[in-house]
Amino acid sequence: MTFVGNASTIRAVVASAGLAAAMACGGSTNTPAGPSSAPPLPFAAESANFRYYYSSGDSVQVERQEAYHAWAVVRLGVVVPRKIEYRKYTSREDMGARTGKSNTSAYAEPEEFTIHTLWSWDNHETVHIYTALIGRPSDFFNEGIAVAFQTDPLSGDFEPRFNGEQVHDAARRYRQLGLLVLPLSRIVSTSGFRGISDSTLSYREAGSFVAFLITRFGIDRVLQFFRTGTRDDALETIRGRFEQAFGSTLEKAEADWLAFVG
């Protein structure tokens, strides 16, 4: 195996043609496509905290990924017990052919310390690996913290962005357009959150609220809330755990968040 390129981008030149990616055709599906029709991605590179798998000619941004990892684990106060497997695909079709799942651009398997992604570096799915070591609340908060952590430490950019837009700017714009889904009691449960058809809006809204909680109450309070929650918590359970962790009702925190967003 030969590596070319600088410290921020590694390219693997796989000697055997048999290790090249086989890409399947077809569009996205709402469910896994069934047994994979292509071989798993080949191992391509390794860094201090990751093992990378990608096709010949593809690349990952190792320096940026390691910088993000170093920042995030300190911020969350976690120790990751093993290297994370980073599986990078060239397209949704490629991902679907190899995993049977083609309805997303990225997903995590925290129990396997594995992420699957189309991106050359990742600051969202890796967060699911880290926070799973702490706890697993409803999807609203679980996705919210991942979005709130979408920063770029290597570039010195610590503003959380989702699909290129700063999350509080997005929340403000959605509110002005009357698009924010309110009150939050409608969507803080997993079923409520997943019931929003516009996932870009739902992720930005959750990310803005959780980023606000981190700013207002501190990361330790947020992590305390994570430790007590489960994915299937009902609304009243979430309300009680929220008040216990933050010393504030969900409704009061929502009002303060909206005042902050403007």
Regions found by a protein language model. Give the residues of each.
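Bacterial N-terminal signal peptides that target proteins for export
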Residues: 2-17
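N-terminal Sec signal peptide cleavage junction
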Residues: 25-29
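Juxtacatalytic substrate-recognition/specificity segment
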Residues: 37-139, 155, 234-241
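Acidic/His/Gly-enriched intrinsically disordered linker/tail segments
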Residues: 97-104, 110-113, 133-262
